[in-house]
Amino acid sequence: MSTTVIMHTSEGDITINLFDDQAPETVANFVGLATGEKTWTDPMTGEKRNDPFYDGLTFHRIIKDFMIQGGCPLGTGTGGPGYDFDDEIVPELKFDHPYLLAMANAGLRRGMDGKIHGTNGSQFFITTVPTPWLDGHHTIFGEVADDESKAVVDKLESVPTDRSDRPMEPAGIISVEVVK
């Protein structure tokens, strides 16, 4: 059984079907952050928190004919939940159509243990066109479920941005509701 979430945004609701079977750790992380069941570290205070992570955050990066990106607690693209985890790349899941939900990351990094690891945390993006150059680099863990939700993604993608791809007017996530 796959998990369904409704992302309530400033432009309307986006229903997303998550790929529990293909990306179980990523789905568990996203759902845990959305509900507050997963502990995260506030980047401003350093305090551990267990409240819904995504509530009130923004889509801090919007690139027309590419994607909308959110999930940064600082609103800059540099913040996260205070931890990271590895990719769950499934070769059968490809960026060959729009409206896919995937983890944003900073690529592979060498950790303190000397091993290479992934840099997934809380940031995600929803594609608005096929993006095959991303295959194998980002964990795909869901898909926008219906035409009404796709229209909301399209509205968000159309928000005016500055030269750094930051929205010139707020484009926000009100909350993420897990409906299972």
What residues fall within each predicted segment?
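Cyclophilin-like peptidyl-prolyl cis-trans isomerases
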Residues: 1-180
